[in-house]
Amino acid sequence: MFTKKNYKRVIYNIVGYLGEILIIWFLKCKGYYIIKHRYKCILGEIDIIACKNKYLAFIEVKTSIFGSEIPITNKQQRSIIKAAKSFITYHTKFEEYNIRFDLYFFSLSKGLIHIPHAWQEF
């Protein structure tokens, strides 16, 4: 049975998933190869892992219906970095790639905002 709280969570999950699908489509149109969508490991998760021209992009997607930008916390950044390191450990063919952490923000009112190299680690 849906409670008001559960209903909101379902809506947020659907909106987030649709935002990720939109960004995947956008990346494919720009010539990126999508390696993984919703990569999860014990250390964290990454929304999208994509590559193009020896660049490996670990991408966080934030989606909002109303246009308010959703911040990414230092804790989330560290979690994504740990998951990225885990991914590369198990997929050694990407060890020589240039690593990038990108942030995509999408809302109906503001459209698409891309922040390449949103943070650094490697």
UniProtKB/Swiss-Prot annotation:
Annotated HAMAP family: UPF0102
UniProt-listed Pfam families: UPF0102 (PF02021)
Annotated Gene3D superfamilies: 3.40.1350.10
Name under which the protein is recorded: UPF0102 protein ECH_0093
MF GO annotations: nucleic acid binding
Family: Belongs to the UPF0102 family.
